[in-house]
């Protein structure tokens, strides 16, 4: 027994230190929550201060826990049980300290982010500011909202979104929905996203659907937000926490989609992006991205991201040693979702010139004069009309003005009995406006009704 006591005393001392550490942390939290309930100002209590038996209670709880543990028949002697019990208490205390350290990065006010980007031409397109706000955060799930403004060549884009995240084993999964509005052009779209984050790998997928119809951009062109999707994988280096790499695939659908914001439209374009992020301290991240399209067009972007977390001391946000904690799976629950906040636009030619050629009556006779009815809508007037088809045989005649839609007539030709004669003629018109734009009309067919006197004597013979 005398040999056992010296061996067990160090473990009890270690146990008391661990318990004291946890108790000190609990006391600190209690003081922060109830600053006026503590009598630590050195004034006499005049015999009214309640006695504090927290230390005795804590020691009694430790002894009770050890007694219950030692009752289990696990094949260990008393010394080994004491050692395992003490190490378990130390592990729990350290785990509590780590969790509280990580939780200190999660302020109920969320975090504000300012991202400044510069493209090949020195423009700040894509620069944005956002505010991530946790609405409800507990052990099961996180409900959040985000407000943001993104700079585009056409003006500001507002981004408003809500979403949820919850833990599934070693993964953090979630979904979100966003409403993006190009304020100056009054163009809107909806975004639907899903995400799955691991400790060193983050996967994100987004789908974008335009809300608004086509809007006039110029006198000859219309625009709207394009429909499309993107897939992104982001990897954090386990051996060097300051570096992140990312790869993203995106595609948008339409005949003239300006994926690179360069003024050139492509049909259903696809682009692949490779990115590298360097985070020296939690507050600052430097980004570099190369975007390559299948058409050969490419784009390079450099960015500086400032990510300020409310409620977290600035000294902590400027500490390089805090990068691993801030980017850990639990410490990054308040990070912004990975999505394209800068809308991609689709364009089409605006219909400033249209023409329709009405179909004449079906029962046309040889020598009959047929008026042609043209319906032309032109923003820039009419320069000329160019008739196509059997214009000569139909004796096409203009009205008072050759560039007017009014007064055009034709004269149906005689019935033809020769071999290969069809007595069918086709006609259409091309309209050119004063801007040089040309539009073709529909094609009409003019058919003669066979005259009575064209029948042969054999066809007129009666048989009794």
From Swiss-Prot:
Highest taxon in the source lineage: Bacteria
Primary residence: periplasm
UniProt entry tagged with the keyword Hydrolase: no
Signal peptide limits: 1-24
Subcellular localization, as worded in the UniProt entry: Periplasm
NCBIfam families: PRK10177.1
Name assigned to this protein: Uncharacterized protein YchO
Annotated organism of origin: Escherichia coli (strain K12)
Phylogenetic placement of the source organism: Bacteria, Pseudomonadati, Pseudomonadota, Gammaproteobacteria, Enterobacterales
This protein's encoding gene: ychO
